[in-house]
């Protein structure tokens, strides 16, 4: 399959825009000057998180919420199926 030059050019431009936005976000000061609340106003907050790290076809799922971990496992299974479909050249029509 031959790539059209315009698609290659657009891909490169999008990568440069992404790098520029990340760099700009790190350089510009944040809108919050004081990151810590005063001692009297500190409250406990429960943040739930979960994530997936793919090392090749092997997923590593982490998190602190059982519900989000199950969702992450399901997403990891879908990602593995997606990778195998592309690796073996199976086309969905």
Swiss-Prot record:
Asked if the record carries the keyword rRNA-binding, the reply is no
Q: Which domain of life is it from?
A: Archaea
Protein localization: Cell membrane
**Which keywords has UniProt assigned to this entry?**
Cell membrane, Membrane, Transmembrane, Transmembrane helix
Keyword DNA-binding attributed = no
Kindly list the GO CC terms recorded for this protein. plasma membrane
Which regions span the lipid bilayer? 7-27, 70-90
Write down the membrane topology.
Answer: Multi-pass membrane protein
Protein name per its UniProtKB record:
Uncharacterized protein MJ1617
Organism, by scientific name, is: Methanocaldococcus jannaschii (strain ATCC 43067 / DSM 2661 / JAL-1 / JCM 10045 / NBRC 100440)
């Amino acid at each position: 399959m031959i790539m059209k030059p315009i698609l290659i050019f657009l891909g490169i431009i999008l990568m440069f825009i992404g790098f520029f936005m990340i760099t700009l976000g790190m350089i510009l000061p944040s809108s919050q000057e004081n990151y810590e609340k005063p001692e009297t106003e500190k409250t406990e907050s429960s943040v739930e998180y979960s994530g997936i790290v793919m090392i090749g076809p092997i997923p590593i799922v982490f998190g602190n919420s059982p519900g989000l971990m199950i969702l992450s496992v399901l997403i990891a299974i879908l990602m593995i199926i997606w990778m195998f479909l592309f690796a073996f050249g199976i086309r969905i029509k």
